[in-house]
Amino acid sequence: MEIRRFPAAEAVQGVAVDEAHVYVVASRAIGKYDKTTGEKVGEWTETEQGPILHLDSGVIVGDRLYAAHSNYPGIPMTSSIEIWDRKTLEHVGSHSFGIYRGSATWVDFHDGFWWVAFAHYGGRSGEPGKDPSWTSVVRFDEHWQERGAWVLPAEVIERMTPFSNSGGSWGTNGLLYLTGHDRAEVYVMRLPTAGSVLELVDVLDVTTPGQGIAWDRSGQEPMLYGIDRARREVVVFAPNQPE
């Protein structure tokens, strides 16, 4: 169920959220907005010749904003996690994966681990010989050492094709919520008890056509934040949470 929405010029790729602010992510810019009023209170913009090319979904962990970054639509795909001070929006760090499993599209921190999706695409944005079925969700420890990886089930890949997994955020119910690039749906996933394929629990209909999402876990009632890219708006939901 949609609760509210407000305009944000950076509503192109994704969002991150903490107890007081929403961080709205464009490819090379971030806007910081008051969560209650929707007023813009800060921003960061990459320089014309700067190294940050294509930011995507983000997450707040402690005093830092972490965002997935890639050279999309470049080939070969390269990826990194870029880091900002959430108070000042000063860029303070980077972890580079180099050429790895694909194009990093979202990052989250859950159950003591980092989780990152590495997307693959169809058409001209894809790597030769690979398609969206090569997309994976990878678990890392605090030192960014890989500690497990999973792929998406065929029925979810079919709904995302020719694009891929754009957003992801862990719910307080222990389930993983994923989005594609253009469909107004959220895919609720569970880690399998065996094998390498995530289990599809539910498909939620929403009013935002894909892109990055973030659970606001700071209050008693968790809220899901997303963006309406066409309207350049941040959208807040109170969806049902399956168990």
Task: Show the residue positions of the predicted features.
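Surface loop/turn motifs at the tips and blade-to-blade linkers of beta-strand repeat domains
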Residues: 3-10, 45-50, 95-100, 150-162, ...
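Beta-strand-rich domains and repeat architectures in extracellular enzymes and scaffolds
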Residues: 3-28, 54-57
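Short, conserved, GDST-rich strand-edge loop motifs in beta-rich repeat architectures
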Residues: 13, 68-78, 117-134, 236-237
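Conserved beta-propeller blade signature
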Residues: 21-24, 65-66, 114-117, 175-178, ...
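Blade-loop segments of beta-propeller domains
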Residues: 39-73, 78-79
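Beta-propeller blade signature
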Residues: 78-88, 131-144, 186-193, 239-241
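Loop/turn-rich, solvent-exposed surfaces of beta-rich toroidal or solenoidal domains
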Residues: 152-192
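Conserved blade-ending motifs and adjacent loop-strand segments that build the rim/top face
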Residues: 196-218
